[in-house]
């Protein structure tokens, strides 16, 4: 059997396939798509942003950092993976540095201890040796003296007003105002008595008025009811006065007083 020379290519040594490198594995020229480069490149994202450069090597591939022996054909993943600073979701070396700084600061804060303050706080007191003295301002001292003087004068006024021991401070001042009015009216009556009853025998009337006005209980009753003591003889003399007769209201009040048995 004669083999034609044209068929001798079946016995020719086939070329040995070379391993494809990462940059040649996906090359369009391998499949005869060179004339489609301008077509599919428009649909692919920018390599600068999303596809890392295979020659960019961020990690150190020294044997000291590798715990296991890695075959050469697996370096495709190692060499092609790198951090993309433009991708917000990819990790960055700065994030590891910030995390280490935060952990260091947090550990320092956890070691901080607040000073131990006393739970008691005293205002206006100072400690000098074993004794404690209160610090007072000039205004506080003046106010304390003023309150002390008011208290002393109030106690002295209460001794002069009949029945003041039965009242509180406000009621005592009200009773004091009425008592002052009673004294003023009683003094005017006594002065008028001296001018109107000079010709009458007023010795008996004078003794009776002295007895009445000398009693604390009677003074309290008179000042509370806002009235004063007037002798009957003096009222009868005033009734005949022309100024009283010309004033119907005063004349009516005098007749009312004379009709009662309260006045002597």
Curated annotation (Swiss-Prot):
The keyword Transcription regulation is annotated on this UniProt entry: yes
GO-annotated molecular function: DNA binding; DNA-binding transcription factor activity; protein dimerization activity
Sequence ranges assigned to domain bHLH in this UniProt record: 134-183
GO biological process: regulation of DNA-templated transcription
Signal peptide start-end: none
Chief place where the protein resides: nucleus
Compartment(s) of residence: Nucleus
Keyword Transcription regulation: yes
Annotated tissue distribution: Expressed constitutively in roots, leaves, stems, and flowers.
Coiled coil: none
InterPro entries to which the protein is assigned, alphabetical: bHLH95_bHLH (IPR045239), bHLH_dom (IPR011598), HLH_DNA-bd_sf (IPR036638), IND-like (IPR045843)
UniProt keyword list: DNA-binding, Nucleus, Transcription, Transcription regulation
Subunit structure as annotated in this protein's UniProt entry: Homodimer.
Annotated PANTHER family: TRANSCRIPTION FACTOR BHLH52-RELATED (PTHR16223:SF49), TRANSCRIPTION FACTOR BHLH83-RELATED (PTHR16223)
Protein's recorded name: Transcription factor bHLH52
Organism, as annotated: Arabidopsis thaliana
Gene name in the database record: BHLH52
């Amino acid at each position: 059997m004669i083999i034609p020379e044209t068929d001798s290519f079946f016995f020719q040594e086939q070329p040995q396939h070379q391993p494809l490198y990462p940059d040649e594995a996906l090359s369009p020229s391998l499949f005869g798509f060179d004339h489609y480069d301008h077509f599919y490149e428009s649909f692919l994202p920018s390599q600068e942003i999303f596809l890392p450069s295979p020659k960019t090597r961020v990690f150190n591939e020294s044997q000291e950092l590798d715990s296991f022996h890695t075959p050469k054909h697996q370096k495709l993943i190692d060499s092609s993976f790198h951090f993309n600073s433009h991708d917000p979701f990819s990790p960055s070396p700065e994030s590891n540095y910030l995390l280490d700084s935060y952990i260091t600061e947090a550990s320092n804060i956890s070691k901080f201890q607040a000073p131990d303050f006393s739970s008691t706080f005293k205002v206006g007191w100072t400690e000098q040796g074993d004794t404690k003295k209160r610090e007072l301002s000039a205004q506080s001292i003046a106010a304390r003296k003023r309150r002390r003087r008011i208290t002393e004068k109030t106690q002295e006024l209460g001794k002069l007003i009949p029945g003041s021991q039965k009242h509180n401070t406000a009621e005592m001042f009200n009773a004091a105002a009425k008592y002052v009015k009673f004294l003023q009216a009683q003094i005017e009556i006594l002065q008028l008595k001296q001018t109107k009853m000079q010709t009458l025998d007023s010795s008996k009337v004078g003794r009776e008025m002295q007895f009445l006005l000398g009693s604390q209980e009677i003074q309290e009753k008179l000042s509370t009811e806002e009235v004063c003591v007037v002798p009957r003889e003096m009222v009868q003399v005033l009734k005949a006065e022309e100024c009283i007769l010309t004033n119907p209201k005063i004349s009516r009040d005098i007749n009312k007083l004379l009709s009662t048995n309260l006045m002597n």
